[in-house]
């Protein structure tokens, strides 16, 4: 029977279904213990991880039976995909499975920040009455810039355009938009930075995209946009982000991911 090792959290229903077909070893703490993982991975045909398990060459060279790696998520920056390719180890991300969930986060976060809900809430519970001092805006006919127009970026565009936002999308690998459900215009990064009231990032973390959104990027943003990152920490230079916010160059930000997790004190 095929043996599968799971090193991070998986929901109970999925685990039960896997157990019906495979010999499964589940230990969600293994992601924190590379030495132990190196020792036991040699006995398994398959490996299932999230983003904490660093599937590097130290682990892979000991995975002598490994045929496939399942990634419970989309990004593959924690997996040495080049090594896997050379060793004929198939790597399968859960592409598209979380698209609706991420799109809902982007829409709800942008609405919350556009309408200044956190500011109103914080002021009210302090005994203040910020009704006349905090100004919110309507999103109708405002611009949403999407950086990275894959499955999730397209779902964000679909949701957002139905709420009245004008959608600009940047992706060097997308040449045209064929889906009639998606009302978006392919744009340059420069146009997105200059026009957008909200910017949402949906990129993999690579050498090319690391710190891609930085001080230079923020200096080009003319409308003091809201910044939302649900892709990978490290794509935004976090120090530059905080500086841009403190200087009122951006109106706010919502981060679902950070370069270091748990987060550092600079965000407190």
Regions found by a protein language model. Name each.
Residues 149-150:
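Glycine-rich Rossmann-fold phosphate-binding loop(s) that bind the pyrophosphate
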Residues 28-34, 72-76, 96-99, 173, ...:
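Short, acidic/turn-prone active-site loops that include or flank metal/cofactor-
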Residues 167-169:
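Short beta-strand "acidic-cap" motif of Rossmann-like dinucleotide-binding folds
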Residues 2-3, 137, 142, 225:
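Nucleotide donor/acceptor-binding cores
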